[in-house]
Amino acid sequence: MEEAGKLQCIIDSNIYQQMKCGGCKNVIALHGSIYENTCPHCGKIYSMEYMRDSEKIPRCESCGTVIRPGVKLFGEMMNSTIMSEASSQVEQADVLLLLGTSVASEVYSKYLNHFEGRYLILIHKERQFLDERADLLILEEPRKVLEKLKF
């Protein structure tokens, strides 16, 4: 969809970067990424493999400080720059496509207030609360729908 010029941005709450790994370019990762971990003291970057392979709590090789995972943990403040960018992208969208999530989702519901476009399309497996807000509702696995559309 991105290559065809039909997709401007993906707003993702997943921390595993599946969209980026799949080749998508403009992805806003709301909750960060497990692939980008940082020492809060000296700023050195560490890979997910370094974190995974550490026998104990991962520490910075340079200064010994505990490495900070690149994801937002429950109770932490969201990055306001990322939230503003996501809101701006939703505001500019002509069509908003929600895949595998709900209009009532705590993560996405606040962004829907910024949507002034023409169509809200929901694709998920089962009926959910507030589905009636959608202009088009498709009750099927999102991956299957995108395959049928050749995306």
Sequence positions of predicted segments:
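Conserved catalytic alpha/beta core of Sir2/sirtuin-type deacylases, generalized to analogous enzyme cores
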Residues: 1-151
